[in-house]
Amino acid sequence: ILSVCGKGNNVADAVAAARILSWQGVAVDIAVIDDDRKKTEEFATQMTIAGNSGLNFVNVSAIPEYDIIIDGIFGTGLSRNVEGIYADVIDLINCSNNVVVSVDIPSGIDSETGAVLSKAVKADATVTFGYNKVGNMIYPGKELSGEVTVADIGFCPEAIKTLNPCMYFTEDDLR
C-alpha cells in the first residue's frame, strides 16, 4: 500500500491511516508530493509520528509499483483547479492499475458541488468521516468516488438530527 499525500489537513488523515495499517502489520509506504506549499501543523505532527514509527518514504514516481493507493492529496477544502505536479500525480494514479481508496473525497472533486476541479482521482472506494459529503453524492463526483463508506468519528447522533438541511436534492441529482 502507498499513501500519497499533499501537505494539508486531509493528508494528515492519510498519513495516520498509513501509520495505523503499519502497526497492524500491513506493508505500507508514504509518498509526499513535494512542492513549496506550507505544511499544516496537523500534517507536520502526523509526519513526525510516522517517521518515528519507522515508515518508509518514497517518491511519487513509485505509484505503479504498488497494489493499493491511499489518495490523500487534497480534501474537502479544495476550491481551486488542480495544476502542476498535483495534476501529474493524479494522472499517474488514474493511469495505473492500482486499487485506489480516497480519504474523505477523491482529490480534485469540489466537496460541495461534485464538480471536477480540472483533474480528479478516480477512486474505487472512498472513506469519508462523520457524514457523507455532497461531492460524493452528486455527479461527476459520485461517479469518481467509487463505493463510499462513512466512518464514525464520534459525532453525537442527537446533535446531527437537530441540524437543518442546507440543501436539498432532486431525484435527478441522486441518479
Name each model feature, range by range.
Residues 66-175:
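YjeF_N-associated NAD(P)HX repair module
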